[in-house]
Amino acid sequence: MITDEAFRQAVKAAIAEHKKDRNIAFTWEGQTYWIKRRLSNGRNQFAKSSVNVQFYTEIARSSIAHTLTGLSPEIVYLDADCMVTRAAGENINHWMRRRDVSEEEKLEILIRTGQALGELHQAGMTHGRPALRDFLYEDGRVTLLDWENMPRWDNKKKRMTMDYLLLLLLLFREPYSEIDYIKALEKGYTGVNGGETRKWARAFLKKHALIGHLAKALDVFHMKDVEAFSRLYRYLAD
């Protein structure tokens, strides 16, 4: 933890300058940091306690993930209203959309992304909503953000399966998605955690085949989320 009073004042100044923002970047002594404030993300306003629950859940789960795997950024400053971490690069979508990044580099980034999720699962943890925007990449290192989601199921196998399916689904949703990219993501994961989770994911989709067939039938309407699920179903279950 950073206990320097000058750092605390820099945090307060950044918040004062961006009063309405939940996530704030600022620079101190040449290093970029991110402040995450105890504010609503706008998605769960109906739940009165959700702001506090999300904030304290994130502190706890992020700290555990950092201790077990190093995949979560270290919390360097903490008070009752915010947490601060060091910046850890740009998210995966940023790298995949850059034209100056080679195909080989993009494949390697996705392999590392899959490895990161596999390492997390190997450590006995799951993420809950592994969106591509929550995976940061810098100099070969992947960092995971947004740990505010409480696990929905006690069954670890089910949680791992949902993590796996969600990550693939969100990649299928992107305009840049290609089968080589999907396979790179899977290669990274299975290289660390084996192929069991993929088998569970395939079995889960087959169990809900009606939804998969419905999504395929709706392809003609070009609805982004439905098309992404249809592609996922065709890839894993057909």
Regions found by a protein language model. Give the residues of each.
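C-lobe/activation-segment region of protein kinase-like
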Residues: 147-238
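Short helix/strand-bridging catalytic loops that position acidic/His residues to coordinate divalent metals
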Residues: 47, 98-102, 148-156
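Conserved kinase catalytic-core helix
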Residues: 58-71, 96-133, 138, 142
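Conserved structural core of kinase catalytic domains
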Residues: 39, 51-55, 73-110
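ATP-binding glycine-rich loop module of kinase domains
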Residues: 12-56
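Nucleotide/phosphate-binding site architecture used for ATP/NTP-dependent chemistry
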Residues: 1-29, 59, 70, 196, ...
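Conserved hydrophobic "DFG−1" position in protein kinase catalytic cores
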Residues: 25, 85-87, 137
